[in-house]
């Protein structure tokens, strides 16, 4: 049985708790991340080395489960989750582009990362929490990965930048910027001017 480890830190004044050694113990690693009542679970599994492959077979899937928000989708009889939404695809790509470059270029071992949203409180966004959980999960394996990755979401309102904004704060924000990096790996943003970005401070 894996030893339970709990780590808590603050980001933008909001407390984030990472827990490992509790669930999915057959995986290489599993990290549960909580911010408020938003909870995600990131699991990492890997297969034996396959030298015949000419690429790195990394697959990453971000899943927003319907039960996380207390929703039931579809007709009276169809209650299962459907194909990935645009949001799930975009978040999966964001996490993938943050994590993939930190593996060795010639690495050929198949790796699967699945991040499942278990609970959503309506205020704390699961997407950023998912990226943090995925980074922590990979970092706690024995895989040759040059992480961890830091992830932060930025909003902008009334001339001030908001670190780790809530859903309600983001609804009134002029900026939706996600930065994931060890130094600088990936930036994803919506609705901002170049002048606004140039004046931002990321210290």
Model-assigned labels for residue ranges:
Residues 15, 28-112, 117-119, 124:
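Glycine-rich, flexible beta-strand/loop modules in the N-terminal catalytic cores of phosphate-handling
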Residues 21, 26-32, 112, 147-151, ...:
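Gly/Lys-enriched N-terminal cap/neck module of very large, oligomeric protein machines
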Residues 138, 142-203:
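Mobile "lid/hinge" segments at catalytic clefts and subdomain interfaces of large enzymes
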Residues 10-14, 36, 157:
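Short strand-coil-strand connectors
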Residues 1-25, 30-31:
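Short, Gly/Pro- and small/polar-rich lid/capping loops
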Residues 98, 129-141:
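Stable alpha-helical structural segments in soluble proteins, enriched in small hydrophobic residues
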Residues 21-23, 38, 44-47, 65, ...:
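Short, ordered loop/turn segments at secondary-structure junctions
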């Amino acid at each position: 049985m894996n030893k339970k480890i709990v780590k808590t830190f603050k980001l933008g004044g909001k407390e984030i708790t990472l827990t490992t050694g509790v669930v999915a113990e057959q995986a290489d690693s599993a990290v549960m991340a909580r911010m408020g009542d938003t909870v995600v679970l990131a699991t990492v599994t890997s297969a034996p080395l396959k030298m015949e492959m000419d690429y790195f077979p990394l697959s990453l899937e971000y899943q927003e489960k319907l039960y996380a928000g207390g929703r039931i989708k579809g007709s009276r009889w169809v209650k299962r989750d459907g194909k990935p939404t645009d949001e799930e695809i975009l978040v999966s790509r964001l996490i993938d582009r943050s994590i993939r470059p930190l593996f060795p270029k010639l690495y050929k071992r198949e790796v699967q990362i699945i991040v499942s949203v278990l609970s959503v409180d309506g205020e704390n966004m699961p997407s950023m929490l998912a990226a943090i959980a995925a980074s922590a999960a990979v970092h706690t394996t024995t895989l040759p990965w040059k992480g961890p990755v830091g992830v932060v979401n930025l909003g902008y309102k009334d001339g001030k930048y908001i670190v780790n904004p809530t859903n309600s704060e983001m609804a009134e924000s002029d900026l939706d910027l996600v930065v994931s990096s060890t130094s600088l790996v990936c930036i994803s943003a919506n609705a901002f001017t170049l002048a606004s970005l140039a004046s931002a401070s990321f210290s």
